[in-house]
From Swiss-Prot:
InterPro entries: Ricin_B-like_lectins (IPR035992), Toxin_P42 (IPR008872)
Region of interest called Beta-trefoil domain, as start-end residue ranges on this chain: 1-155
Subunit structure: Forms a heterodimer with BinB.
GO molecular function terms noted in the UniProt entry: toxin activity
Consequence of substituting residue 104 to A: No change in toxicity against C.quinquefasciatus, slightly higher toxicity against A.aegypti larvae, protein is more like BinA from strain 2362
Entry protein name: Binary larvicide subunit BinA
Function as written in the Swiss-Prot or TrEMBL entry: Component of a binary toxin active against Culex and some Aedes mosquito larvae. The individual subunits are not toxic. BinAB binds to the gastric caecum and posterior midgut of C.quinquefasciatus larvae; this subunit alone binds the entire larval gut. Binary toxin internalization into host gut cells requires both proteins. Toxic to Aedes atropalpus mosquito larvae; mortality towards both C.quinquefasciatus and A.atropalpus is maximal by 48 hours. A.aegypti is not very susceptible to this toxin.
Taxonomic classification: Bacteria, Bacillati, Bacillota, Bacilli, Bacillales
Post-translational modification summary for this protein: Processed by proteases in the mosquito gut, probably at both the N- and C-termini.
Protein family according to the UniProt entry: Belongs to the toxin_10 family.
Propeptide feature: residues: 1-6
Domain notes: Has an N-terminal beta-trefoil domain and a C-terminal pore-forming domain. The trefoil domain has barrel and cap subdomains; the cap has 3 carbohydrate-binding modules while the barrel is involved in host cell receptor binding. At neutral pH the carbohydrate-binding modules are accessible on the toxin surface but the barrel subdomain is not.
Keywords: Disulfide bond, Sporulation, Toxin, Virulence
Subcellular locations according to the entry: Spore, Perispore
Amino acid sequence: MRNLDFIDSFIPTEGKYIRVMDFYNSEYPFCIHAPSAPNGDIMTEICSRENNQYFIFFPTDDGRVIIANRHNGSVFTGEATSVVSDIYTGSPLQFFREFKRTMSTYYLAIQNPESATDVRALEPNSHELPSRLYFTNNIENNSNILISNKEQIYLTLPSLPENEQYPKTPVLSGIDDIGPNQSEKSIIGSTLIPCIMVSDFISLGERMKTTPYYYVKHTQYWQSMWSALFPPGSKETKTEKSGITDTSQISMTDGINVSIGADFGLKFGNKTFGIKGGFTYDTKTQITNTSQLLIETTYTREYTNTENFPVRYTGYVLASEFTLHRSDGTQVNTIPWVALNDNYTTIARYPHFASEPLLGNTKIITDDQN
């Protein structure tokens, strides 16, 4: 797995809940205000609910962070003049950069480091509590923009499974052996994914406390398409499938905000766009280069046995399987998301010294999302 730690030691890693403090009023933490507060204000005040005071800084590919509250999973969100707490959508206004000011303090900005978040009282020019987050262009000598990380609660990250060798092609043991329906599965890669980016029946607030990070596992295996005993010189037409079913494509998009492109690369939605580089690196996949989604295709192919003796042939296609898991390893999607890639096919045969069948005409039967 790639290293997600931040460079500066005072900036948190993905493995902690952080209690963020106003540097000016250092005794008072940032706190998600009561639901009755307008616009989900982030306040600096005396906060009675402990979970409202702790945040996870979820890192993204480019070093920005998504700051999520431990109580309900709401995230820091920029508005016209202030920063509030809102549900995560992947909006650019929910990605913050951290700029170091001293060894123990920093300030937050969305894009422009000259426009920082500013901790100010509800009444201008006052340091009375409660106060809230605004944007300001006043950076120099402005202690109101400074924040620091005080208390930390460490969390246990999911243990990712070890990667394995690519799956071996099945070997037939006799003329009547049709081979396994699936070869042994091999884990190709796994990656962490923040709980705010996935879909689960567990409430977001509960996820933030029990499984703030999920993981996605990418597995590959050889899937049998057909098997037949070819008499000497015979020709047969076989039906094969490629791609992914519409049901699986929709379920995968709903589950992890990732879909599979027509070139078998991954397409990322707004929620996961910020982690697409790390996601594909860890799972040993690629980002799609097309706007078209992969669909299921059924086609027929003609095969001819060119030998002067009977041969058993079994056709296989490479399957890529994706599963979503909670931090304790339990699988969320009970039916895995599987794509069959007909760019990678193989034909097992017996006797082993027999040549592969001669490939003839190929005809697409269906090419739709049914």
